[in-house]
């Protein structure tokens, strides 16, 4: 371990590995869940703080030949963290682009807390994207059809298909759980292939991971 003027250049510790694991799980869950999951604000903030900390250590170690090898390792860790964050955010933007109307409608109907579901940037993006798409459809399609058919009701909004099948794994033993009239004893060591909707609350509650 090298410390002092240049900070602690120890290998990645258990806390950092745990944070990396949480970030990867957030990305994979977002990737395989058909709906938009709550924005992992705490995890993202912690990861960004860790990136800034490592970047600061690397910058201060440039002139110290004894720390350059470890600094190079840190730079690789930084790039890995940035890559996973990028993948996570891209998955979310894809869903916002696809389901923007249903997301905003559910927020409007108080089905979701907007500040848990979306980051501040995502809220602004979703609203602006909807305004852009509404304007596009109005100018290219709706103006050319009778007014009686111009209004879009909630049934015509694109929504995620929640009955898709997914692979999932409990984070802990959950005991008996009712899934489509069948009782399943969820074990931490087992992997299941089930419809998403019955386990949606477990995924959103952090008790089940998608794989």
Swiss-Prot record:
Keywords: DNA replication, Nucleus. It comes from the Eukaryota. Signal peptide: none annotated. GO terms for cellular component: GINS complex. It is found in: Nucleus. InterPro entries: GINS_A, GINS_bundle-like_dom_sf, GINS_Sld5, SLD5_C, Sld5_GINS_A. The keyword Transport does not apply. Its main location: nucleus. Belongs to the GINS4/SLD5 family. The GINS complex plays an essential role in the initiation of DNA replication. Component of the GINS complex which is a heterotetramer of gins1, gins2, gins3 and gins4. This is DNA replication complex GINS protein SLD5.
């Amino acid at each position: 371990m090298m410390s002092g003027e240049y900070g602690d250049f120890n290998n990645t510790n258990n806390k950092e590995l745990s944070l990396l694991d949480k970030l990867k799980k957030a990305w994979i869950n977002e990737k395989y869940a058909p709906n938009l999951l709550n924005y992992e604000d705490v995890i993202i903030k912690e990861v960004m703080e860790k990136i800034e900390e490592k970047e600061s250590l690397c910058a201060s170690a440039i002139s110290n030949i004894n720390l350059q090898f470890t600094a190079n390792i840190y730079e690789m860790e930084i790039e890995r963290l940035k890559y996973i964050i990028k993948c996570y955010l891209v998955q979310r933007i894809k869903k916002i682009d696809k389901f923007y109307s249903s997301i905003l409608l559910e927020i409007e109907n108080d089905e979701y807390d907007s500040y848990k579901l979306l980051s501040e940037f995502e809220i602004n993006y979703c609203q602006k994207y909807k305004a852009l798409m509404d304007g596009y459809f109005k100018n290219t399609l709706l103006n050319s059809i009778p007014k009686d058919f111009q209004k879009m009701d909630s049934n015509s909004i694109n929504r995620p298909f929640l009955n898709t099948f997914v692979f999932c794994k409990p984070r802990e033993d959950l005991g008996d759980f009712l899934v489509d009239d069948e009782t399943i004893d969820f074990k931490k060591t087992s992997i299941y292939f089930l419809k998403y909707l019955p386990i949606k609350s477990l995924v959103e509650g952090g008790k089940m991971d998608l794989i």
